[in-house]
């Protein structure tokens, strides 16, 4: 039997299943998910300081967006969970395909005199951080 209204039950259930790791999401960003994954593969498993340095000197456009997202995830970990940024590392990072949109007036010529609209790629990027234990503690 439920304790209250179904919206209250759903709120309690969602609170129990909420993600416990520090994380940050970037939604509907105007970069291809394939190009974002190339940058994300470089930082998975690295500590936060090293990952930020890699992103700072990466010439790709997606690296700038991912660096800001990493800074947001670190700030979430420090402010919301009270973790030290020296012990944090990038545990999981992924980019998924978002809902792409079409350029309104630009067309790409196709076969037999036809044309199709140019599709603009959009992606959703997520970064999850983990906490490494210090070398002294076992």
Indicate residue ranges for each PLM-predicted region.
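Ribosome large-subunit tunnel/peptidyl-transferase-proximal elements
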Residues: 2-94, 124-132, 136-138
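Strongly charged
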Residues: 98-138
């Amino acid at each position: 039997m439920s304790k209250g209204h179904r919206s209250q039950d759903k709120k309690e259930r969602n609170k129990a299943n909420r993600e416990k790791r520090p994380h940050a999401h970037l939604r509907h960003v105007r970069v291809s998910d394939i190009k974002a994954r190339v940058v994300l593969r470089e930082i998975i498993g690295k500590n936060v300081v090293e990952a930020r340095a890699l992103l700072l000197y990466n010439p790709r456009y997606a690296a700038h967006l991912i660096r800001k997202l990493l800074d947001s995830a670190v700030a979430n970990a420090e402010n919301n969970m009270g973790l030290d940024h020296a012990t944090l590392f990038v545990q999981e990072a992924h980019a998924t395909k978002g809902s792409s949109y079409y350029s309104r007036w630009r067309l790409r010529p196709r076969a037999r005199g036809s044309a199709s609209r140019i599709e603009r790629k959009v992606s959703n990027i997520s970064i999850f951080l983990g906490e490494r234990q210090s070398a002294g503690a076992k």
